[in-house]
Amino acid sequence: MASIDGLPPLREVIRAHGLSAKKQLGQNFLLDLNLTAKIARLAGDLTNSDVLEVGPGPGGLTRGLLAEGARRVLAIEKDARCLPALAEVAAAWPGRLEVLNADALEVDLAARLTPPIRIVANLPYNVGTELLTRWLSSDWPPFWESLTLMFQKEVAERIVAKPGSKAYGRLALLSQWRTDPKIVLTLPPEAFTPPPSIHSAVVHFTRLEAPRHPADPKVLARVTAMAFNQRRKMLRSSLKGLVPDIETVLREAGIEPTQRAEEIPLEGFCALARRLAG
């Protein structure tokens, strides 16, 4: 990568700027520029897209995105210590990188980007799930074309899980309702500095133009939250606060009241959401 952008290896960048990953910010720096380039390629053709990156750290993935031809990258970094390193990346790619020192949970990201937009990020562990849930719960179709996101491997497995498995839950439902998510890369702890205690995985989400089954997003979100907060309880118990006669509503949706949340496929929860909304 250094031969492409003229910048030093990431270990040198980290040493030069005195950077160390902060656990409280959910940081783990990915230093292998071959891997960051691979993740950028897994996001698809970037040449005509704006790319949103959250948590760029010292800029390893940022460099990969720019080298792979991203039209423009907007990098949101909460940690001000990383800004000088990112400024060096911006100088190497004039006019193509904008760095915003902000919390991604508090910024209107769509307003700063020009479609088509792809989101590619090694998400900070402490906000990754919340950001994903927001991006999946927005108006549809959303402002983004695709998501290519790194998570803890356990979270990635929850995203692609099927009914009846231990990993199956609300995150799988929300992800698979409106996108086609696939695990496209698994990374060992030693790929990062500092090495986390777990493996990581990259998930690529291809958005669907319409949800797989019709349902009101707010109703579906509420139903799945209640059902999976008490996932081992029968649905007639976990959902009893929704309506006076929940057993009748469940049966009308094709669900037995004695079933548990982990047994119900996406289609069943969408049918239940429609009955409750109607």
Swiss-Prot record:
EC class name: transferase
Lineage: superkingdom: Bacteria
GO terms of molecular function: 16S rRNA (adenine(1518)-N(6)/adenine(1519)-N(6))-dimethyltransferase activity; RNA binding
InterPro entries recorded: KsgA/Erm, rRNA_Ade_diMease-like_C, rRNA_Ade_Mease_Trfase_CS, rRNA_Ade_methylase_Trfase_N, rRNA_adenine_dimethylase, SAM-dependent_MTases_sf
Gene3D superfamilies listed in its UniProt record: Ribosomal RNA adenine dimethylase-like, domain 2, Vaccinia Virus protein VP39
Pfam families: RrnaAD
Keyword terms: Cytoplasm, Methyltransferase, RNA-binding, rRNA processing, S-adenosyl-L-methionine, Transferase
Reaction equations catalysed: adenosine(1518)/adenosine(1519) in 16S rRNA + 4 S-adenosyl-L-methionine = N(6)-dimethyladenosine(1518)/N(6)-dimethyladenosine(1519) in 16S rRNA + 4 S-adenosyl-L-homocysteine + 4 H(+)
Enzyme nomenclature, EC number: 2.1.1.182
SUPFAM superfamilies tied to this protein: S-adenosyl-L-methionine-dependent methyltransferases (SSF53335)
Main subcellular location: cytoplasm
Gene Ontology CC entries for this record: cytosol
Residues noted as binding S-adenosyl-L-methionine in the record, renumbered to the chain: N28, L30, G55, E77, D103, N122
Subcellular location: Cytoplasm
Annotated function: Specifically dimethylates two adjacent adenosines (A1518 and A1519) in the loop of a conserved hairpin near the 3'-end of 16S rRNA in the 30S particle. May play a critical role in biogenesis of 30S subunits.
Family: Belongs to the class I-like SAM-binding methyltransferase superfamily. rRNA adenine N(6)-methyltransferase family. RsmA subfamily.
Protein name (database record): Ribosomal RNA small subunit methyltransferase A
Organism field: Cereibacter sphaeroides (strain KD131 / KCTC 12085)
